[in-house]
Amino acid sequence: MRLWLALIAGVLAGPTHAQTWATREVCLLDEARVHPEIFTPAFYANLQTRSAEIPNSVGRFWRITSVDGAVSHMWGTMHSSLPMILRLPNQVTDTIKAARIVATEVDYTQQTREELSASHTSSDRYRDATEISVRDMALPSQLLIWIEERLIGLGWGDEALDYLSPAALAELMLADPCGDFAAGIYPIQDDRIQMLGAIHGSKILSLEAPRALFQKLSDDGGAGLTRAMIAVYANYLNPAITQEMRSTSHALYLQGRIGEMMAWDELYFSEAYPEEGPDWLARTNDYLLRERNEVFLGSAMADLLEGGVFMAVGTYHLPQEYGLIALLRKAGFAVERIALEGEARP
């Protein structure tokens, strides 16, 4: 679900507000390239060392073959609506068009009029008397300032921090402020893939129920997982983010250097919040990646055995020993990388 954490380790915000930094000039990139000057030499060396330790850390496009020879494909997405991210390689687009099934993390199209009505009322997104307030979660005060500014920018008002439930707040934090400019006009890459599949006659498979994330966080009651997710995603609101940082993170994605993106997150939280940062990230990843990967695989298994599936999930779901590449191999599938032009070699 995460895109990247475009922050230099150790850089904390000045007086700039969390919403005002996300201007069109910062957000709408003309090109993506790595800017090595944004890293200290020591940080970059540690980043390279850590990324080399992450299994299956290079590549976005993978062929999946069952023991009976049925072929499917998996693509690591970036949850972004930038044209450079929406511009998929021809080989990927052709595979989507030919797919029997296009599977995405969540199919958010409404299935009934009742679901549509419920999505507009949002009554369960308001905090009741039994739920903890985000202000009482003992989070760093700077994070609360960034969150409050973000909520104001989204139109929730300056009191939303007090009346939204922890689950609703965590879910709202998932949206990148830089996506605001094209919201409702340009789809994020995942939604474009789903749309292409639908246009070309593919069946759409939702790998997870639409409200699964919200329900998980609601059941958590604002405890460990929800608090950790709020802390992690509040850091995406850091006003220290620059266009060079965003350019670098997008370049790493387009070059298939996914392990470096994940290592960047790890090192940032270890250095910026040495006491709690690693635990925040670990708790978040344990659910968003590790636990949900098992759900995704279970949802797709029968169709993968038959073949013809194009599975599109956030690119962080692919690497690591708990990633989908490793889980698919453990389940008996052959998983081979399809290297694309411009991507790095392992």
What annotation goes with each model-predicted range?
Residues A13-P15:
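N-terminal signal peptide c-region/cleavage motif recognized by signal peptidases
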Residues A282-P346:
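C-terminal soluble interaction/assembly domains
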Residues T20-T284:
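Structured, acidic catalytic/metal-binding patches in enzyme active sites
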Residues M1-L7:
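Sec-dependent signal peptide recognition
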